[in-house]
A protein has these predicted regions:
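Acidic/His metal-coordination segments adjacent to aromatic residues that form catalytic metal sites
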Residues: 116-124, 182-201, 245-264, 308-315
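Extended ligand-binding clefts on enzyme/binding-domain cores
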Residues: 126-138, 144-151, 162-165, 170, ...
């Protein structure tokens, strides 16, 4: 009978005989696998797991893993060492350990499925909240991992959202928050869903999508992917141009804090999104709009520095003196080499963060 996983939780046990203890090395292994015939309900389409895209069955998967075990193990060891070495060179041993944990979380928190043509579609799941699938502000912090290791999977995570946003189902001028509740990607469930703007994240998600698509274009050296969805990007940038600098009483990815009007960090995201759109225009050969949006972003950045100023740091919101918050969205100014904000802004922010950080890290505000 169907039941919850936590109800009479099943336990599997295995006994391996390693023989008598001696100086000789003995090695054995177990294979754990999950045979999901279908992975995701994507708007009525039952998507197969990616490994099944060419007709492979569970027994085939296990057999292939056993037959190629030694080679796969070697590949994993080589990759692990190369990754850790690269990260250690960038930030040291402690930083490498944190990144190793982030690697596991980014990869394990996703389901890789195949569409009808066998193309990859990547669906993250919110594992510590309401189980939303393909949440844009979960994709956003996850994406640098895939930008670094697999731009193909960047596209695989963005395409489901972009296709939904381009459909008749999504009627708003801003980007959606999610596609449903895992494993059903059948329409947004967060906030007002598809019905109202209540509880949405308009500036947050619109900015996220534009910044990520610009980052992908930078990695690939062209804006071909962006061009496939240009009407959606243009719609979102029009919204950000009107609403982004001084956000209304909206939620952002830090929704545990509740609604916050005049959110300074959210404003940073909108400003850099305008510049990122200008960057995409430049790659598409549209010099007029490229100049327009990059100029607009730089003008807003100057206004932002004044509106958010609180002495030796910036405010959490334009109307809240004697406050502060992390301005992590500033990172895209550096990643995309947009040069929108005065470098003094970042220098000042980081200097203050170092003062208020505790051994366990830096709080949000």
């Amino acid at each position: 009978m169907p039941r919850a996983v936590s109800d009479e939780l099943p336990v599997a046990a295995m006994v391996l005989d390693f023989g008598n203890v001696s100086t000789s090395v003995v090695s054995q292994y177990l294979i754990l696998a999950y045979d999901d015939e279908y992975s995701i309900n994507y708007f009525g389409q039952k998507l197969r797991p990616y490994w099944r895209r060419n007709g492979m069955q569970a027994l085939d998967l296990l057999t292939a893993a056993v037959n190629d075990y030694a080679n796969l193990q070697k590949q994993c060891e080589v990759f692990d060492q190369e990754l850790i070495d690269d990260i250690t060179k960038l930030g040291g041993e402690k930083y490498a350990r944190v990144c190793a944990l982030a690697y596991r979380q980014c990869l394990a928190g996703n389901k890789l499925a195949a569409d009808a043509n066998g193309q990859p579609m990547l669906f993250p799941k919110e594992n510590s909240s309401n189980g939303c699938i393909a949440t844009v502000d979960v994709i956003y912090p996850m994406e640098p991992f895939f930008l670094f290791l697999s731009p193909t999977l960047v596209k695989a995570s963005l395409v489901p959202v972009l296709n939904y946003a381009a459909s008749d189902r999504w009627k708003f001028p801003f980007a959606p928050h999610d596609l449903g509740c895992y494993p059903k990607a059948t329409g947004q469930v967060y906030g007002g869903g598809e019905k109202t703007e209540d509880g949405q994240m308009p500036v947050e998600e619109s900015g996220n999508m534009i910044l990520l698509i610009a980052a992908l274009a930078k990695i690939e050296g062209n804006a071909e992917f962006a061009s496939l969805y240009w009407p959606q990007l243009t719609k979102w940038i029009n919204y950000l141009e009107e609403k982004g600098f001084d956000p209304e009483n909206q939620l952002c990815t830090d929704d545990f804090t509740g609604h916050l009007a005049h959110n300074a960090n959210l404003s940073v995201k909108a400003i850099l999104s305008l510049a990122a759109y200008g960057y995409l225009c430049e790659m598409r050969g549209d010099k007029i709009n490229s100049a327009k949006y990059q100029k607009l972003a730089k003008e807003m950045a100057v206004k932002w520095a004044s509106a958010a100023d609180d002495g030796v740091h910036s405010r959490i919101a334009f109307d809240k003196p004697n406050t502060w918050s992390q301005k992590y969205n500033l990172v895209w100014d550096k990643i995309l080499n947009l040069n929108v904000f005065d470098p003094k802004v970042t220098v000042q922010e980081i200097a203050y963060y170092k003062k208020v950080a505790i051994p366990l890290g830096l709080s949000y505000d």
